[in-house]
């Protein structure tokens, strides 16, 4: 039987060269599971706590030796002898042992690593792919890739306020073709930037990070790349933005200050009207974190104005948390949630959040973090849950490409899994 025999953990590096936690779970049956935990750059105030050592002599204080120690010295003794097939029980026990509402005792990075490694050991024991184990008979849909081709904000050192400008190859007939559409646009965008004398260095998530005059210029140059690649904006490929508005919200004056707009300040309503102008002008189908995570009144107004037209994704707003999401659903705020495993800290809680979103007709976007690794868990999770969308960066950096390549493998295995394209956005009315 797949009873837990030992749990190992180590400090490894993520795509930014910062330490993170890798966990290996071994069972008496010989079944084995391994997981590496990602890390974010722009993090919501209400996320589960990522435990760091704060020892300035190691990794500028970002070491995770205490989290590793918590896995081997605290968690392992508690889980020894449990079957990895009891995922819900394991995750509840992890939460109980931690004993805090935000996992600040053991660290969400320690807890998530164990949670995922146990699930992967269970899949290994049953000789199933991870998406098959998590999704059972349900996996039947390939996700639309939300490809971050221009990085700004906290993900790049440039003059662009908004954190991500994405392309969504919604008009493609399959995931494989959608990936091709995106890759071709990415390369055309690189050529255009070079022609304009702009740098083609990339940000944390593999997108270009040029110094542009405004956020709108980013949209314009992406449209140029789409057309240059031979695709039609608004038909073959749509646009999306992760504004990450909390990053430029000034709490003192309670305004949103856009550096690229000559430090012009916007009230919540003024920023919503700015978005309305962009949506009317460009084929934008998704805006993430359009307002500060605590600006619930502003979010309410944003949803009233644009909620029927485009996808309004809550990341920092909901932090993959059922309590936060329930509040949003009750108040009709947003219509989509970004799903990040390490925001909540266990596989079970993540699946519960996705289920809650679906029951309320909110879409769920499975997402990476800016600090990623070769771990491809989120690719399997997107298919297992039929989320229909995945956000895992651009067409560069192996830590991003690893997820896309895993999805290509899964698409081959599922053979007839549909790519629903525009139908993925089932809750939009206009």
UniProtKB/Swiss-Prot annotation:
The keyword Lyase applies. Its main location: cytoplasm. Gene3D superfamilies: Enolase-like C-terminal domain, Enolase-like, N-terminal domain. (2R)-2-phosphoglycerate binds at residues 163, 340, 369-370, 391. It holds the Pfam family Enolase_N. One of its GO terms (cellular component) is phosphopyruvate hydratase complex. It comes from the Bacteria. It is found in: Cytoplasm; Secreted; Cell surface. Its EC number is 4.2.1.11. Keywords: Cytoplasm, Glycolysis, Lyase, Magnesium, Metal-binding, Secreted. Its cofactor is Mg(2+). The keyword Metal-binding applies. Mg(2+) binds at residues 242, 288, 315. It is an enzyme of class 4 (lyase). It catalyses: (2R)-2-phosphoglycerate = phosphoenolpyruvate + H2O. Coiled coil: none annotated. One of its GO terms (biological process) is glycolytic process. Catalyzes the reversible conversion of 2-phosphoglycerate (2-PG) into phosphoenolpyruvate (PEP). It is essential for the degradation of carbohydrates via glycolysis. Belongs to the enolase family. This is Enolase. It comes from Aster yellows witches'-broom phytoplasma (strain AYWB). The gene is eno.
């Amino acid at each position: 039987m797949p009873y837990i025999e030992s749990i190992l953990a180590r400090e490894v590096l993520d795509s930014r060269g910062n330490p993170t936690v890798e966990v290996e779970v071994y069972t008496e049956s010989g079944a084995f599971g391994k997981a590496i935990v990602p890390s974010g750059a722009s993090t919501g105030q209400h996320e589960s706590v990522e435990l760091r050592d704060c020892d300035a002599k190691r990794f500028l204080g970002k070491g995770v030796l205490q989290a590793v120690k918590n896995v081997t010295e605290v968690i392992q003794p508690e889980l020894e002898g449990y079957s990895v097939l009891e995922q819900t029980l394991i995750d509840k026990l992890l939460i109980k042992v931690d004993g805090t509402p935000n996992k600040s005792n053991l660290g969400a990075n320690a807890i998530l690593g164990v949670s995922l490694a146990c699930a992967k050991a269970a899949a290994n024991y049953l000789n199933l792919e991870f998406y098959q184990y998590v999704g059972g008979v349900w996996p039947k849909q390939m996700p639309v890739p939300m490809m971050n081709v221009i990085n700004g904000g906290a993900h790049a050192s440039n003059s662009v306020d908004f954190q991500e400008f994405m392309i969504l190859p919604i008009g493609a007939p399959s995931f494989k073709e959608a990936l091709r559409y995106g890759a071709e646009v990415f390369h055309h965008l690189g050529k255009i930037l070079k022609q304009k004398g702009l740098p083609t260095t990339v940000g944390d998530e593999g997108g270009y990070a040029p110094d542009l005059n405004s956020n709108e210029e980013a949209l314009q140059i992406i449209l140029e790349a789409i057309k240059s690649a031979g695709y039609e904006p608004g038909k073959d490929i749509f646009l999306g933005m992760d504004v990450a508005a909390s990053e430029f919200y000034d709490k003192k004056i309670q305004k949103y200050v856009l550096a690229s707009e000559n430090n012009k300040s916007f009230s919540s309503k003024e920023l919503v009207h700015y978005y309305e102008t962009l949506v009317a002008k460009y084929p934008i189908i998704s805006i993430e974190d359009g307002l500060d995570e605590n600006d619930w009144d502003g979010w309410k107004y944003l949803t009233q104005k644009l909620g029927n037209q485009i996808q309004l994704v809550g990341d920092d707003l909901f932090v993959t948390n059922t309590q936060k999401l329930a509040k949003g659903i009750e108040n009709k705020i947003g219509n989509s949630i970004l799903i990040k495993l390490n925001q909540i800290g266990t596989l079970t809680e993540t699946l519960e959040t996705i289920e809650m979103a679906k029951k309320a007709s909110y879409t769920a976007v499975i997402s990476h973090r800016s600090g990623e690794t070769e771990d491809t868990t989120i690719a399997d999770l997107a298919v297992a849950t039929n989320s229909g969308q995945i956000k895992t960066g651009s067409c560069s950096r192996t830590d991003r490409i690893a997820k896309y390549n895993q999805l290509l493998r899964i698409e081959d295995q599922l053979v007839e899994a549909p790519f629903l394209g525009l139908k993925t956005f089932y809750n939009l009315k206009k």
